[in-house]
Amino acid sequence: MTPRKTVVPPRTALVIGAGMTGLATAWFLQEAGVEVTVVDRRQVAAGASWGNAGWLSPALAVPLPEPGALRLGLRTLLSPASPLYIPPRADPRLARFLLSFSRNCTPRRWQVAMSALAPLNRQALAAYDELARGGVAEPTRASYPCLIAFTTEAARQPFVHELEAVRAAGQSVDYDLLSGAEARDQEPALSERTGAAVRLHGQRFLNPGAYVAALADAVRERGGKVVEGLRVTRVQDHGSEVAVVGSDGTDVRADVAVLANGAWLNRLAAPFGVRAAVQSGRGYSFTLPAEGLPTGPTYFAAQRVVCTPLGADRVRVAGMMEFTAPDRPADPRRVQAVVDAARPMLPGADFSRRSDEWAGPRPCTADGLPLVGPTRSPRVHVCGGHGMWGIALGPLSGKLLAESIVTGRSAAELTPLHPLR
């Protein structure tokens, strides 16, 4: 643990953002006896939490900026059919983010970021177990089979190389290599185009919307307040307390505040010295009837498409990454891009029966590491920027941040995640 100036534990806390990271932070603050109020501009799980794939897969939680991202080329990045899409428009802030992102797409920087993520990944599932023991009612489920499907063995090789790099960073990764026939025996929904696969062990998944709602219920049951529909315009540090001011003039006060408002984090965090940009990396999803779809979590790596069972009769199909403003309207071409990418791999699926089409702004950082810890003010803290891994790493991040707030000591795992880096 890294010592900080001795602090008096707060009695009250305001958490801005009712997604996974915000609610997990609130829950773990309650564990320490802190009275919490959570506020959200819309509602529980309204940002990046509700419609994502729901994978709790530490083996796959790697830095988003990777060397392969630079090989896509400008023409591909500007195509709405591409897995990674950048809508062409004048946006100086996005341009600065992309420049910084590209500088982190090197093997050395990827290894540095992976070394920071590995200790978090090792503890991620244990944080979920703690929430379950504490009364969060929605379960997590074992991912078996958890398949990563490819068209050829050659296409699989870079993914296997990445798994070995994750292992080299100090993280346990357990997997088997399957032939196409073995993968199709395991998961009959896969098409003949599946020529190779990786079967991961020790992973989990959940229904993210249901889980985050259950986490909000658990916070309420412990006496916490969850205020929906309050758009926070600014946070003020008054020395002895923090004030959260809403667009309607609401003024809510507490001893400390936690900024966990996802892709909108910079608007509130910048006055407290947080310079690292948090960029919306929007993902898309929809739900299909389960017939003709995988029975277990399945990822088509080249297509960047994920399938996740939601109970016995529905499957979520999710994918894509789109760097754009978080409040921009969803682009229907991106939903079609998911359909077009998935259809050849899943011949039995009826994509005309889509429901619950969704777009969510995942909060991404240029170096691929979240922002978790104190700001320039000892009363204002940050928990965000997890990119694609907010569901997997949100509970652990909330636990470590809550411990830091209450004790004044930060765990070593938080050092590379410092919001003022």
Which residues does each predicted region cover?
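C-terminal catalytic lobe of FAD-dependent flavoproteins
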Residues: A302, L346-R421
